[in-house]
C-alpha cells in the first residue's frame, strides 16, 4: 500500500484493535431442567481469538469443555476465561490480535443445547466495532448476540 491508500484505508475501514465484549446474564442463567429447585449457577465463559473457524466448527461441546485450547490449537491465537454470575455481567476488553479473524464465545452450561448449538457464538472480525462493545446475553442455557443500535445517517 502506498501512503495515500494507507490513509484512505484508515479513514474508510474500521480498525478494531481492542476486543470489547459485554456479557449480561439473566437470573435464569445456567439451570438444569432435571433440578427441581431450578437453581441458577455461575457460568464459565471462554473467549477464543481464531485465525480460522474450521477447528471450532468441527468441535463438539464435550471436546471444548475438556480440552478447548488443544482442540482449537491449529486456529487459536489467544483465549480468555470469565465467570459470569446469574443476574450480573462481565466485561472483556483485551487486545485483538491482527491474526484473529474470528472471536468465538463458548459458555460451559450445565445443560447446553447441543442440538441447536446455542452454547457458542462466533463473531467475524468485521462484526466487531472499534469503539463499542458487542453485547452478549446469557440466559436459559443459551448465548444471544444483541444487535448493534442503528446508526443515524449523516445525509
Q: What is the meaning of each model-derived region?
A:
Residues 35-46:
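Short coil-to-beta strand junction motifs in C2/discoidin
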Residues 62-78:
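Short beta-strand and strand-turn-strand segments in soluble, beta-rich domains
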Residues 87-96:
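Exposed aromatic-hydrophobic patches
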Residues 100-111:
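A short, solvent-exposed beta-strand micro-motif common in secreted/extracellular proteins
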Amino acid at each position: 500500500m502506498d501512503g495515500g491508500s494507507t490513509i484512505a484505508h484508515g479513514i474508510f475501514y474500521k480498525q478494531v484493535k481492542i476486543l470489547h465484549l459485554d456479557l449480561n446474564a439473566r437470573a435464569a442463567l445456567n439451570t438444569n431442567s432435571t433440578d427441581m429447585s431450578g437453581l441458577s449457577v455461575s457460568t464459565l465463559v471462554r473467549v477464543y481469538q481464531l485465525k480460522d473457524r474450521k477447528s471450532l466448527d468441527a468441535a463438539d461441546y464435550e471436546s471444548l469443555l475438556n480440552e478447548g485450547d488443544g482442540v482449537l490449537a491449529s486456529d487459536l491465537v489467544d483465549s480468555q476465561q470469565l465467570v459470569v454470575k446469574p443476574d450480573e455481567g462481565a466485561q472483556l476488553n483485551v487486545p485483538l490480535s491482527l491474526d484473529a479473524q474470528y472471536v468465538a464465545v463458548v459458555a460451559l452450561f450445565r445443560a447446553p443445547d447441543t442440538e441447536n448449538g446455542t452454547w457458542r457464538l462466533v463473531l467475524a472480525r468485521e462484526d466487531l466495532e472499534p469503539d463499542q462493545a458487542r453485547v452478549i446475553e446469557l440466559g436459559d442455557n443459551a448465548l444471544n448476540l444483541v444487535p448493534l443500535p442503528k446508526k443515524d445517517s449523516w445525509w
